[in-house]
A protein has these predicted regions:
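Amphipathic alpha-helical coiled-coil/heptad-repeat segments
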Residues: 102-155
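Short, solvent-exposed alpha-helical surface patches in well-structured domains
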Residues: 64-67, 77, 97, 107-111, ...
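A short glycine-rich beta-alpha junction/loop motif
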Residues: 45-52, 83-109
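Hydrophobic residues in beta-strands and at strand termini
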Residues: 4-6, 40, 57, 100-102
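Short, ligand-facing micro-motifs at secondary-structure edges
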Residues: 1-3, 22-48, 53, 63, ...
Length: 155
C-alpha cells in the first residue's frame, strides 16, 4: 500500500518504522523468501505490515543485523528449520535455535560500513552492466529487424 489514511496512521505507532530500524518478515509463501528483511535508512514514514517484526534497538547495529539476516549462513539455518505447506512461519522456537555472530557494537558498525561501501560499488557495476545488456539487446533486435525487412542485405 503506497498511501495510508491519516486516521490509520494516528493509531499505527506500533507499526511505524523509523530510520535505523530493522524489519524482518516472520512468514513467507516460499522457502526462498524465509527470513526476508530490510534496514530502513530513510526518514520517510514507513509502516510495517502483518507478519513483520520491527527490531528497534540501540544495543545492536540494526544495519549489521540486516546484513547478517541476508547472509546465506543465517538464511540456511532458518530454511532448514521452517515447515509449512502454503506458508512458512519463523517461530520464536526457530529463532532460539539459530546461531548468529554478534561481535561488539564497534565491530558491527565497522562491518556494516565496510559492506555499505563494497556493496555500493558492486551495485554500481551491476547497474552499468544492465545498461550495456539493454543496449546490446536493442542492437540485436534492430539488427534482426533490419535484416528480415531487407534494410540490410546479407548477400
Amino acid at each position: 500500500i503506497r498511501f495510508i489514511p491519516r486516521e490509520l496512521a494516528k493509531n499505527g505507532d506500533s507499526a511505524l518504522v523509523k530510520q535505523g530500524d530493522f524489519i524482518f518478515a516472520d512468514t513467507s509463501e516460499d522457502l526462498e523468501g524465509c527470513g526476508n528483511c530490510v534496514y530502513n535508512d530513510t526518514t520517510n514514514p514507513i509502516y510495517a505490515g502483518y507478519h513483520t517484526i520491527i527490531y528497534k534497538t540501540r544495543e545492536r547495529d540494526c544495519k549489521y543485523l540486516a546484513y547478517l539476516f541476508r547472509s546465506n549462513v543465517w538464511r540456511s539455518q532458518i530454511r532448514c528449520r521452517v515447515s509449512g505447506i502454503k506458508v512458512y512461519s519463523i517461530t520464536q522456537g526457530i529463532m532460539s535455535q539459530v546461531n548468529i555472530l554478534l561481535p561488539p557494537m564497534s565491530e558491527q558498525k565497522e562491518i556494516s560500513t565496510y559492506l555499505d561501501t563494497k556493496c555500493s560499488k558492486i551495485d554500481h557495476i551491476i547497474a552499468t552492466q544492465k545498461k550495456k545488456i539493454a543496449y546490446l539487446q536493442e542492437l540485436k533486435q534492430s539488427l534482426i529487424t533490419n535484416v528480415v525487412t531487407g534494410k540490410i542485405k546479407v548477400s
